[in-house]
Curated annotation (Swiss-Prot):
Region spans: Disordered: 1-30, 232-262
Biological processes annotated in GO: nuclear-transcribed mRNA catabolic process; positive regulation of nuclear-transcribed mRNA poly(A) tail shortening; positive regulation of translational initiation; transcription initiation at RNA polymerase II promoter
Lineage of the organism: Eukaryota, Metazoa, Ecdysozoa, Nematoda, Chromadorea
Protein name: Uncharacterized protein F10E9.4
Compositionally biased residues, Acidic residues: 9-21, 232-245, 253-262
Membrane-spanning ranges: none
One Gene Ontology molecular-function label: single-stranded DNA binding
Source superkingdom: Eukaryota
Signal peptide (UniProt feature, chain positions): none
One GO CC term on file: RNA polymerase II, core complex
């Protein structure tokens, strides 16, 4: 049944008309605005983000000892990073606050830290450095934490083992420690050794290219360490897709003009 509308005619009489009313909205439709994801689901994001990690904190500590034994101490170091964090009031509970701080810490993995001149490769425990506090009438509370990290600090002239991910004329792209991208300049030895994708090579570090907290290393080819095994047809197709992704990423990085070099 529609709504009644009273209309006054020219002769002074009043006429009643019924107007069609809109169909009632479904309850689910009314609450759609509540389902808009304005933020990140910490538990889901944390789980998917952890699957991308190539090194945990304990493995990082073992690798530090191993590198010290080889006389390469200082390339991989343990650091404690102080950080100020502000969180909304609905995360003021102990469990929620710990989850949030841990998630924030995990997002530093793979990022360049200017204060250390290195790249975070693993994150350990997050310790509370100060009690949560409220400032004026802000819609968030504040706290300070100490994040235990493993940081890779590259040094000019050092040589690192890298796995080749992409090869083109004049340039190769590889990863150091399976997570840090490095652009490798080719030379005469490259063609002699017939470097291909998934080969393990030795690279001489020559610099770093930084854009905000993102970065990639630069280096020159030194020698072949280990040739990759010959793969089956299905694996080759997957590799081709991965090579295409890397190629697009390299093109995007080359288009950046405002990068800072060290």
């Amino acid at each position: 049944m529609g709504k009644k509308k009273f209309i006054e005619n020219e002769d002074g009489t009043t006429e009643v008309q019924e107007t069609e009313s809109e169909a009632p909205k479904d309850k689910k439709e009314k609450k759609e605005y509540r389902l808009r994801t304005l933020g990140a689901n910490i538990k889901t994001s944390k789980k998917s983000f952890k699957e991308q990690f190539f090194m945990n904190y304990e493995d990082g500590l073992k690798l530090i000892k191993k590198m010290r034994g080889k006389g390469k101490g200082g390339q991989l170091v343990q650091k404690v990073m102080p950080r100020h964090i502000s969180l909304p009031y609905h995360m003021s509970g102990k469990a929620a606050m710990e989850e949030a701080c841990d998630w924030i810490a995990q997002n530093t993995v793979g990022k360049y830290r200017k204060e250390y001149k290195g790249i975070v490769v693993a994150v350990g425990s997050v310790d509370l450095a100060s009690a949560p506090r409220v400032i004026s009438d802000q819609y968030a509370f504040h706290t300070d934490v100490a994040i235990n990290q493993i940081v890779f600090i590259p040094k000019i002239g050092d040589q690192y083992e890298a796995k080749v991910k992409y090869v083109q004329e004049g340039l190769m792209v590889g990863v150091v420690m399976d997570m840090i991208t490095i652009h490798i300049k080719q030379n005469d030895k490259t063609s002699e050794d017939q470097v291909a994708i998934d080969d393990k090579i030795l690279v001489k570090y020559s610099g770093i290219r930084i854009k905000s907290s993102l970065c990639h290393l630069k280096g020159e080819y030194v020698k072949m360490i280990e040739k990759a095994e010959i793969k089956e047809e299905e694996e080759v197709e997957d590799e081709a897709d991965e090579e295409t992704d890397v190629k697009e990423k390299v093109k995007e990085e080359e288009d950046e003009d405002e990068d800072m070099e060290e």
